[in-house]
Each structure stands twice: as structure tokens, then as C-alpha cells.
Amino acid sequence: DLGADKVVMYRYNQGILLEDSDYTLNVLPGSGPRHMIFSKDGRFAYLVNEIANNIMVFKYNEGRFNLIQAIHCVPRHFKGFSSASAIRLTSSGDHLFVSNRGHDSIAMYRVNKESGKISLLYMVHTGKGPRDFNIIDDQYLIVGCQDDNILQVLTFDEPNEKLLLSDSSIELPAPVCIAVER
């Protein structure tokens, strides 16, 4: 919940979602949690905070979160407005990506699968307002640049840890969601 600075868990019971306050994750005021994803094995959770512009890494066990790392999504020297938006893991779980509106970039991180911690590899600048993106076949990132009215294609070479902006783009009014059928 962005305004309440918490992640709320729900239980599904006979067609009804019920909030489970015993498992609410409270984060620092002003963080603005946006999206959370889990490692493939379920041991780690990655929370992107849109206001604090950071990623919080948690060890996860039986509904409990233990913070093990917090890392910025944009360079510390960046002085403009930025708001972290989407977060994705590759199917291998070896790399994590975050989009940053304002800084207009995709940040690429290496994931240590033993500790769950991440380390920044580099950032690729995109069009304006990369609100959402998705990974296609672990070879491409399709980025919806809302403020430039385009979908951009980035090429991803996982074995060599390379992410490059390609020449391919498609005009599309204010893309806000990149959904992929699996």
C-alpha cells in the first residue's frame, strides 16, 4: 500500500480475500512500496519502493520477512525527480531489473542466489517515463515509455550480462502495462 507504507498479505478462503494482519510488512514511512516479487525458490522477496527509489531485499520464511539489504535504484548523485516503477526477475533468477521514471532508465542487478542480495551491474537509459516492462524469452525487455508514447526494445544477453538499447521501437499512446502470456 503506497500511502500506508506497508505490504498487506491476504488469505483466500472460499472465494473471499481476507486481510491477514499478522503478516503485514511495515516499511519506513515515505518508502511507497509499489511491487514485490519472490525468488523462484520462494526464499527471498524483492520490494521496489517508488518514493524512496530503492529495492528492499527480504529473507522470507512462513509469512515472515527479514530485511537483509536496501539498495538505491538511481545513482546517489542524481538530483532530479525519479520514481521507481516495475521490477522483474529473469527466469533463471540470476538477474533483476527495475525501471526508473524521471531518471528514465532500467537498472540491471546480479542476484546472489545463496544470500538473495543484489548488486548493480549498470543502467541503460530509456525513453521518458518507463512505467512498466517485461522480459521476453530472456532475450528482450519490452519497455513502455509512457511519457514518450513508445514501446522500446532492449536486447539482453544473460550469459555475458549485457543489456543494450536497440533501434526498435513502436509508437503507442501512453503505454502503462506490458503483459505477457506465459
Each PLM stretch: what is its role?
Residues A107-T155:
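C-terminal hydrophobic structural anchor segments
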Residues V48-L96:
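Oxyanion-binding "anion nests"
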Residues Y10-L17, F58-N66, Y109-G116, L154-K162:
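Short loop/turn segments immediately following beta-strands, especially the blade-tip
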Residues L18-L25, N66-C73, I118-H125, L163-E171:
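Beta-propeller fold detector
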Residues Q146-T155, L164-R182:
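Blade-level signature of beta-propeller repeat domains, shared across WD40, Kelch, NHL, RCC1
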